[in-house]
Amino acid sequence: MARITVEDCLEVVNNRFELVMMASKRARQLANGVPPLIENTNSEDKPTVLALREIAARKIDSKMIDEIEKAERERTEREAMEWAAAEVVADEDMSKSDD
């Protein structure tokens, strides 16, 4: 696959700072298991390269990245609440068995 350049991405994103922020957030999402939006023909591509390819292909924008982050954050919070609730139930069960 052709090499991706910053210039390719700057045709989509207005400035380098925004590009760096978008690419780093998206790369983190990809590294954490969020599936890529483009075909990953080269399995050796690192998450950063995939993120830049998605940006250059106009498959992702900052709004989509923020929505994915929000969904991941909500999922994590929900899981934490479920674990906390399970611990409370387990603690109550243990205190009842001590009686």
Curated annotation (Swiss-Prot):
Gene3D superfamilies: 3.90.940.10. Coiled coil: none annotated. It catalyses: RNA(n) + a ribonucleoside 5'-triphosphate = RNA(n+1) + diphosphate. Pfam families: RNA_pol_Rpb6. The keyword Zinc does not apply. Keywords: DNA-directed RNA polymerase, Nucleotidyltransferase, Transcription, Transferase. GO terms for cellular component: DNA-directed RNA polymerase complex. Its EC number is 2.7.7.6. One of its GO terms (molecular function) is DNA binding. GO terms for biological process: DNA-templated transcription. Belongs to the RNA polymerase subunit omega family. Promotes RNA polymerase assembly. Latches the N- and C-terminal regions of the beta' subunit thereby facilitating its interaction with the beta and alpha subunits. The RNAP catalytic core consists of 2 alpha, 1 beta, 1 beta' and 1 omega subunit. When a sigma factor is associated with the core the holoenzyme is formed, which can initiate transcription. This is DNA-directed RNA polymerase subunit omega. It comes from Xylella fastidiosa (strain 9a5c).
